[in-house]
């Protein structure tokens, strides 16, 4: 059976918000806003299909921006995806959603729509813009009514870590189908997320307790434990056990960079991971993605180079978040700054 390969495709930088932690403007607040032309979008699409044909994968697209719905050819692109029967998720804003728009998305084959909540009302609106918090929670209902799975993602940093339990309550009350959080990735060397390792472990413990309480009460929200440090936490608490008979040198879980995804920006630049700022490997208008995968991407598959993880029994299952490590040090294989495990 073929496995899916995901393309996170940023079709435009256009957006109704200017979030303080946005990667688009992280190093250049006066950056020109790029958008991919319809001709280039078709070229990109067929390059991705060629990749999947060569490597025997099924394509899956995460269409994003900016806010992708602002692209003048957004609906035309969805028509192309529908023509080929390819499933997709939208990562976008809430501001242009209503029942009719969400139903139209569903008709084109949209499976999930991901929104962001990055704090309780005051903090979230400070990150994004006034009114964003309430609008985001309100639009969860539009997404659900259309039969699309509503996903809420939180980016955790020192600014909002204390609010995460409250965010979970708000998201559950709004009826979100899925909730997940990941850590903010510093966007140039020596920046820090401002979270001590044991403080982050405590967040996982607090959330684990809350998730279990909601699940026991029949809550329908699925809590996606996205951060790979959950594996370490569950290993310590006995929920996760290393299976017997595992193959030496085989990777069974953890970060998927170099395994099953690529990121494409509006300029055509291809990144191993959007959150790793120095991970540009190609340009989709100039390079064949199928070749990039077995050439330039090899540098992200040398698991023996992980400075700390290579000495840990969880290497094949965890590896933390290399993007966070890279954001702090510039080194993809450096120690995850929030990993609390002592490894000798």
Annotate each PLM feature.
Residues 1-111:
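Conserved alpha-helical substructure of the radical SAM core
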Residues 2-3, 25, 29, 270-344:
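Flexible mid-to-C-terminal extensions adjoining Fe-S/redox cofactors in radical SAM and related proteins
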Residues 10, 31-32, 36, 108-112, ...:
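Radical SAM enzyme [4Fe-4S]-AdoMet core and its adjacent flexible, acidic
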Residues 18, 57, 109, 175-177, ...:
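Short loop/turn motifs at secondary-structure junctions
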Residues 25, 64, 116, 182, ...:
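Conserved residues at the C-terminal ends of beta-strands
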Residues 27, 96, 120, 158, ...:
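Positions that flank functional sites
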Residues 41, 200-203, 289:
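Hydrophobic/aromatic residues in well-formed alpha-helices
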Residues 66-68, 94-95, 119, 252, ...:
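Active-site metal-binding loops of divalent metal-dependent hydrolases
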């Amino acid at each position: 059976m073929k496995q899916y390969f995901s393309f996170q495709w940023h079709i435009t930088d256009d957006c109704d918000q200017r979030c303080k932690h946005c990667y688009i403007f992280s190093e250049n607040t006066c950056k020109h806003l790029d958008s991919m032309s319809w001709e280039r979008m078709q070229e990109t699409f067929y390059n991705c299909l060629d990749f999947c044909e060569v490597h025997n994968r099924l394509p899956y697209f995460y269409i994003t921006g900016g806010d992708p719905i602002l692209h003048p050819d957004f609906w035309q692109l969805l028509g192309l995806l529908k023509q080929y029967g390819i499933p997709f998720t939208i990562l976008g804003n809430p501001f242009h959603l209503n029942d009719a728009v969400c139903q139209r998305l569903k008709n084109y084959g949209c499976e999930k729509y991901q929104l962001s909540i990055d704090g309780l009302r005051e903090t979230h609106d400070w990150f994004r813009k006034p009114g964003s918090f309430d609008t985001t929670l309100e639009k969860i209902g539009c997404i659900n009514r259309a039969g699309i799975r509503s996903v809420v993602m939180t980016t955790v940093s020192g600014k909002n870590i204390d609010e995460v339990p409250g965010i979970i309550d708000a998201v559950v009350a709004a009826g979100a189908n899925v909730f997940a959080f990941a850590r903010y990735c510093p966007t140039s060397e020596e920046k820090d997320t401002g979270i001590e390792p044991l403080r982050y472990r405590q967040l996982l413990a607090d959330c684990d307790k809350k998730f279990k309480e909601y699940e026991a009460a029949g809550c329908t929200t699925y809590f996606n434990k996205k951060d790979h440090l959950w594996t370490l936490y569950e290993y310590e608490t006995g929920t996760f056990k290393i299976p017997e008979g595992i193959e030496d040198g085989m990777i069974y879980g953890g970060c998927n960079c170099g395994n099953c995804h690529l990121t494409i920006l509006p300029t055509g630049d291809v990144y191993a991971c959007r959150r790793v700022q120095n991970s540009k490997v190609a340009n989709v208008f100039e390079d064949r993605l199928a070749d990039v995968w077995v050439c330039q991407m090899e540098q992200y598959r040398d698991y023996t180079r992980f400075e700390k993880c290579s000495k840990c029994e969880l290497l094949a299952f965890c590896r933390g978040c290399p993007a966070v490590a890279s954001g702090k040090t510039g080194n993809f294989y450096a120690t995850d700054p929030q990993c609390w495990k002592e490894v000798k």
